[in-house]
Structures are given as structure tokens and as C-alpha cells.
Regions:
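Gly/Gly-Pro-rich "capping" loops immediately C-terminal to redox-active cysteine motifs
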Residues: 29, 45-72, 81-85
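Residue-level hotspots at or immediately adjacent to binding/recognition sites across diverse folds
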Residues: 21-23, 42, 83, 98-100
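N-terminal signal peptide c-region/cleavage motif recognized by signal peptidases
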Residues: 14-17
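C-type cytochrome heme c attachment motif
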Residues: 33-41, 54, 65-68, 93-97
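Sequence/structural segment immediately N-terminal to covalent heme-attachment motifs in c-type
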Residues: 23-43, 56-58, 107
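C-terminal capping alpha-helices of c-type cytochrome domains
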Residues: 12, 75, 84-109
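Bacterial N-terminal signal peptides that target proteins for export
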Residues: 1-8
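Cleavable N-terminal signal peptides
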Residues: 8-10, 20
Length: 109
């Protein structure tokens, strides 16, 4: 009986955790479409100019650091500084994770 209760509890916790992850992914995808897609493409793979970087497959910690630097002004680009400024730390983290999970630049071993 105790094993059944533990199994049911774990199933409930994992189910809610997966739902939260799916919600975070959906929110990040929507934010990426609203804020990033016009220049970087919807999946971060088709930048509109050669000077615009591909975001797909970049490391999430790099993307997060870059966005935080644009937000603080430590990294300068008029467009990116303005776009990063209103983003919350959570949105930045979610965007970084979203683009890092898209197929792209990084070779996975």
C-alpha cells in the first residue's frame, strides 16, 4: 500500500513538473516569436542579415549572459539594448533555454 501511495505521489509530482516545463517552453516560444523572430528567424536559424547571429543551438548560459549584458548596457547594440531592457530575468533564462534547444550551431556528442 505504501509503495502505491509513493508511486501515485511521484506520478503527480512528475506530471506537474512536466506541465510546468511545457508551459515554460510555450511561453518562451511565444516570447521568441514576438521579440526575436523578426531579426533571427522563428527558430533562431534564419537571420535577416549576415551580421545577425543565429541563436539556435547556442549555449544557454552564453545567450543568457549576452541578453543580460544588452539589458545592463555592458554590451552595446541599439536594437538589442532596447529589446532586452523590458525582459524579466525569468524571460531571459527561458529564451536562452528555448534557443539552446533548437537544432542549430552546436554539435551534440
Amino acid at each position: 500500500m505504501n509503495k502505491l501511495i509513493i508511486a501515485a505521489g511521484l506520478t503527480w509530482v512528475l506530471g506537474h513538473a512536466l506541465t510546468a516545463l511545457a508551459d515554460d517552453f510555450a511561453a518562451a516560444k511565444q516570447k521568441a516569436e514576438q521579440v526575436c523572430a523578426a531579426c533571427h528567424g522563428p527558430e533562431g536559424t534564419k537571420p535577416v542579415t549576415p551580421d545577425t547571429p543565429k541563436l539556435a543551438g547556442q549555449y544557454d548560459d552564453y545567450l543568457e549572459h549576452a541578453l543580460l549584458d544588452y539589458q545592463s548596457g555592458a554590451r552595446q547594440n541599439a536594437l538589442m539594448n532596447g529589446l532586452a531592457k523590458p525582459l524579466s530575468k525569468q524571460e531571459i533564462k527561458e529564451l536562452a533555454q528555448y534557443f539552446s534547444q533548437r537544432p542549430g550551431l552546436r554539435t551534440r556528442y
